A protein has these predicted regions:
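Non-catalytic terminal accessory segments
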Residues: 1-126
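Soluble catalytic domains of enzymes that build or remodel membrane lipids, polysaccharides, and related
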Residues: 131, 136-244
């Protein structure tokens, strides 16, 4: 595990303990949930995160990628809960200044964090929103006037279990009848190369003036700029230190 992974695991562990300790001491939780259940849930979910980082990160296969997805999803939930509970504690002096308000605010923070987590999951699974802009370019050649360029960013695709979602994105791109398509970074998550099923879906993106791309930071995480053929097999031509 790299330094970043170690620091991330330690940070999430601290947030994890804080969230379960502060949520577990809420009056309503203390009355209705046995301590053993809280401890078991806390340890179990922490192990899911650690297993996702240790055994799922950078590995191929449905099980490994599913494990990492579960771990990273739980990390996001913990982060939201931590920020909201910590804010409630700061506002009330951790219960020493405003003890009654602290319990109310902490309970509200937990509820808000869970609701935001559900909203975030929904937003992450829905199709991207299409925004249309008319761009005026001084000196543009007459034969290029009125052309449609579709720009797509931050798809963060990686595994075959998101193939249906990606296929929906490709259908939306094709429905716009683009003259050119540009993929502007973070096309994949970068933990492992895109598999054949993903390449086949990307290959359905077509445009008369070509499908072009640039690398984002997530491509560099997996060393993919050194393997452009993995993308070019899908008909994507990458620009790196050059223009066209």
């Amino acid at each position: 595990m790299h330094i970043f992974g170690i620091v991330l695991t330690l940070a999430v562990t601290v947030m994890h303990v804080y969230v379960f300790f502060r949520a577990g001491t809420l009056p309503v939780v203390k009355r209705t949930v046995p301590p053993q259940v809280i401890i078991t849930a806390g340890v179990g979910l922490w192990l899911v995160f650690v297993a996702g980082r240790t055994f799922g990160h950078g590995e191929s296969g449905f099980f490994a990628r599913s494990l990492e997805l579960c771990g990273m999803t739980w990390m996001a939930v913990v982060f939201l809960l931590f920020m909201l509970i910590f804010a409630a504690d700061l506002l009330t002096g951790f219960g020493f200044i405003l003890p009654r308000a602290n319990a109310i605010l902490r309970g509200t923070a937990v509820a808000a964090g869970l609701v935001l987590s559900v909203v975030g999951l929904y937003q992450g699974m829905r199709q991207p929103v299409i925004r249309q802009y008319e761009v005026s370019v001084p000196g543009l050649a007459a034969n290029l006037d009125g052309k449609t360029v579709v720009a797509v960013s931050d798809l963060h695709i990686e595994s075959a279990f998101r193939k249906k979602w990606l296929a929906g994105v490709v259908r939306r791109i094709r429905s716009l009848n683009p003259d050119m398509v540009v993929l502007i970074g973070d096309i994949v998550e970068g933990h492992s190369p895109p598999d054949r099923e993903i390449q086949n879906v990307l290959n359905r993106i077509e445009a008369p003036l070509g499908v072009w791309g640039v690398f984002g930071n997530h491509e560099f995480y997996g060393g993919l700029p050194g393997k452009p053929d993995l993308f070019e097999a899908s008909g994507i031509r990458f620009l790196r230190n050059r223009w066209t």
